[in-house]
Amino acid sequence: MFKFKIFAFITLMTFAFGIALVGDALAGEKVKLRSVMYGTKWEQINVGDEEGHVIAVYEAKGIDTNMQGKKFMDGWLYRESGLMDMNGKAGTWSAQGYGECTDRDGDKIFITWEGKKDKKETGEGTNAILKGTGKWQGIQGKGTWVAVPAVDNRWYSDGELEVELPR
């Protein structure tokens, strides 16, 4: 159950980042997003050096919501993949990965993210836009996120992203 909560948490973080990239944002505008995600794949290897220490690869999917009521990234599909080094017994993890945000027309924004959780309920980190396709080609941005576990393999992530849209 712990691995699913962690998986959900990381997926949520990435999802939140994806939400920030869609819609009617202005150049240099900060966008507030919420991503709700669920884990779809999880593979782990026990490290063996201490109880609860594992390395895991996962995938998650979800939906982005623009918390400012704008169209940018609102309702976009989000897919995330990541690598996690975690200790379920200690309640800590560090992770990094990639996200793919897809708008209603099929154009995409790709992101990279990293973060950690140190014995608290939430994880936090940073993200950055790698590139966009179609109308999002040339988009740039970076931001922060906080992920919160919900139930089982589901979580949500709140983030803020400063975006510069393509010209």
What are these model-derived regions, one by one?
Residues 1-11:
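Bacterial N-terminal signal peptides that target proteins for export
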Residues 19-27:
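Sec/Tat signal peptide C-region and signal peptidase I cleavage site
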Residues 26-167:
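Beta-strand-enriched cores of mature, soluble protein domains
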Residues 10-20:
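Bacterial N-terminal signal peptides
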